[in-house]
Amino acid sequence: RSTLFPYTTLFRSDRMGPVELASCAFGQSSKISYMEMAAAVCAVVNGGRLMQPYLVSDILNPDGSILQHTEPVCRRQVIKPETSETMREMMEAVVLYGGGRNARIQGYRVGGKSGTSQKLDSADEKARIASFVAVAPIDDPQFLCLVCLDEPHSWTTAGGSLSAPVCAEVLEQTLVYKGVPRAVEPETDTDPAQTAADLPADGDSFDGA
């Protein structure tokens, strides 16, 4: 179990055989909370630093003064800063040209990734959880939104189709509320048609939706 979240189940290296290693490659060997998922993605985009997640930043007195403040704590460096930079570029490409197009926000650079997972504790073998995580601005990460839809009733279970638009709406309102200025979307030398051919057209779906 993880020390970060007591109900999270992870494989230790000394208990991971060939089967566990293979299944971990596509995310079917570990159970984690949505909070821990968000923390992991934050580490991917913020230079590789795994931060201790928290829910309350400040506790205020009745007069508005700060009674207690939570200081951000870096648990450890999990990937190199150069790797984090590469991942930000890849996540932005997903939103610009791949299965995350529905997460685009006019005037803001957004990066994201879809995730359509099998739900093993359901009586329906086709049950899925459609998710999408988005970060903005992806060139200077400030906000992350993770949307997970449990067994959505839709023609598709792809997170890029169902959850990405919700991420876009939440992030756009947050960016505007926080006063982050809109900017002209950057030009790219990459051919959109060529890039799109290398990326999933509609997220990660086990049933091909």
Language-model features, listed with the residues they occupy:
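A residue-level structural signature of the nucleotidyltransferase/glycosyltransferase Rossmann-like core
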Residues: 2-3, 48
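Active-site beta-strand/loop architecture of penicillin-binding DD-peptidases
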Residues: 13-74, 82, 91-179
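Short, small-residue-biased leader/transition segments that mark boundaries at the very start
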Residues: 3-10
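Short, highly charged C-terminal tails/helix-capping segments
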Residues: 181-206
